[in-house]
Amino acid sequence: MQNKEPDEFRESTSIFQIWLRFRQNTIALFSFYLLIALIFTALFASYLAPYADNRQFIGQELMPPSWVDRGKIAFFFGTDDLGRDILSRLIMGTRYTLGSALLVVFSVAIIGGALGIIAGLLKGIKARFVGHIFDAFLSLPILLIAVVISTLMEPSLWNAMFATLLAILPYFIHTIYRAIQKELEKDYVVMLKLEGISNQALLKSTILPNITVIYIQEVARAFVIAVLDISALSFISLGAQRPTPEWGAMIKDSLELLYLAPWTVLLPGFAIIFTILLSIIFSNGLTKAINQHQE
């Protein structure tokens, strides 16, 4: 063991090998392609939507979906109480809900990852102090933290994103912090430190590759939470405001039409659930592929 190089304690493999394993999981691969399609939709929503998201068609209010007797193919998912095409609003909503969640997760992954690494390398009293701070945050639900932060700011989508970011960060940092602390307690780390290896070399060669699975799982979890929280904040009027076609805001604006025109509420809800399920299936498949190679 003493003759081993630091890289020999690395448990992860190349990205190409992981991809080959991942491709064998048909369902996970399909979910990956669908997620890419959703991201593509978010980027080019204004070109893909049949109509402008706030265009009102007079006399076409509460038109049911096209597969219902009264429905029209021109309004594939029907219209709302103002005569706006729901399909167009759902497509544009991809930019607001999915796009916002991706921006939040990207920020969490970078900021949370960096702070988690710094916290994980702390020792002694500093490490215990940081641990107690995290324990205090972990006693509160993420959505509750986001709601409290949002109430201190003016209701808007950007403020909802900021509140969601601040709410997720402590949990993300704590997970990375614990993963690194656990890795530092392993025998190979103690041995490498006795040989005089620097923390930077130790992180790069072994610790960070060995917590890749945990990192991916937390990023996927953060994405799911971001989608839910941004939609929830808009639903309770703390996020996106009218007439922004954010999915949570669409549900709020049409909630009173649930029995009269259920498609105006159910379709945005299905969009949220569909996005979350795709993310979970993809992350589980990727995690499984990494674990298979580590074995």
UniProtKB/Swiss-Prot annotation:
Top-level taxon of origin: Bacteria
GO cellular component: plasma membrane
Cellular localisation: Cell inner membrane
GO molecular function: putrescine transmembrane transporter activity
Family matches, as InterPro entries: BP-dependent_transpt_permease (IPR050366), MetI-like (IPR000515), MetI-like_sf (IPR035906), OppC_N (IPR025966)
Membrane topology listed for this record: Multi-pass membrane protein
Domain ABC transmembrane type-1, residue spans: 98-278
Disulphides: none
GO BP: peptide transport; protein transport
Spans traversing the lipid bilayer: 27-47, 102-122, 129-149, 157-177, 219-239, 262-282
PROSITE patterns assigned to the protein according to its UniProt record, in alphabetical order: ABC_TM1
Main localization category: membrane
Recorded family membership: Belongs to the binding-protein-dependent transport system permease family. OppBC subfamily.
Function (record text): Involved in a peptide intake transport system that plays a role in the resistance to antimicrobial peptides.
Annotated protein name in UniProt: Peptide transport system permease protein SapC
Gene: sapC
